[in-house]
Design a protein with these regions (language model features):
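Active-site-proximal alpha-helix that buttresses catalytic centers in soluble enzyme cores
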Residues: 1-150
Length: 150
């Protein structure tokens, strides 16, 4: 269910697809976390589609997801990197993959669809709150302490 602050996204959220882009990993946890984030965003009912894509090591790839979304008649596709900070992946690798995928699907997309590349998570007080919550949980013994696991 959409939260009050979700309404700021716009009245046409139903015409927007969001692609959460992760790095990818040989371990299953990375993909599982991204899928859970996708599920939670999807439950808000804001967007027509919410998908996950990976740079490497997992599927689906960025290119595969964009090509599939290109055929759905959406007005906007927002590519949201799920990375904490800017780096080579967010400033070079992902934009290049998006460009290649978008150009490859241009025949299916047409001129009226926009691909928007969002910023990584970055420095944000909401992240500070999460970090402080995790520290508090650790101090209060709600999480496994390192000395217990050694």
């Amino acid at each position: 269910m959409a939260k009050e602050e979700d309404r700021d996204i716009g009245e046409n959220g139903e015409d927007i697809a969001v692609v959460l882009i992760g790095h990818g990993s040989t371990l299953p946890y990375n993909k599982e976390v991204l899928e859970e984030l996708r599920r939670r965003i999807e439950l808000r009912g804001i967007f027509k589609a919410v998908r996950v894509a990976f740079m490497q090591l997992n599927s689906p790839s960025i290119e595969e997801v964009l090509r599939n979304l290109a055929k759905d008649g959406l007005q906007k596709i927002v590519a949201q990197p799920v990375f904490l900070a800017d780096g080579a992946h967010t400033t070079e690798d992902i934009p290049e993959k998006l460009k290649v995928a978008f150009e490859g699907a241009w025949e299916d997309i047409g001129d009226d669809v926009k691909l928007i590349y969002a910023k990584p998570i970055g420095e944000d007080d909401r992240i500070v709150d999460i970090l402080l919550d995790r520290v508090k949980e650790a101090v209060e013994g709600e999480l496994i302490r390192m000395e217990q696991s050694l």
